[in-house]
């Protein structure tokens, strides 16, 4: 999830940078006009919004207070402490009859290492209604301008094994390379055992690719839930994967490329990663969509 303030006791006041100097926070102005809407009202509209990049977190938009409808927000008694930014103050948003409690936060007196954020506020993404960059709506979280996605056609033989059976085999896959994520293999439906796929009600959204729908794989009496996804209408920046099918590397028996088994990655969708995150929360990376 994004780097919103973490609820914790506010007893410590010393900057975490003193004990963890390798921790990174970058606060960078965005050249895009960014807007936020709630209950039909524009509550933030700025050409001076900043992206905050933070170790192990997704980017977050911060807005100058001058570009935010602070008159629609009421300070609350809620506070949280971040060892790298300081103590966060919160505001409840109210427009008409709708209220979003503690939906807005800021650091009025941040640590000196991040002093620039002091006159800015941020919004919990899912507590407001709509986000826009220029005139296009964006979803899930801000897109990272330093992230790259390449979908490249390959004639290498790709085989997907589930439940001991080859459920997909192709020399027409598109290999999707995405910064800091495992390679994904998008396969034409003609090269997938579609008779084994059962449409699922699950959908997810990715800010870089669009909205995905899912399929489960049924082999005999065994159902492998939500193992496959597809983007029927990807966003304009990612057209090459339209209608292709992709299997979770983490959960199939094997993915073979030219006969060689691809090592299973440890990602936010892996059981090993999830187990580790329960015991060492700070090791968790950002949860993006596959």
Question: What residue ranges belong to the model's regions?
Answer:
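Terminal leader/tail segments of proteins
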Residues: 1-290
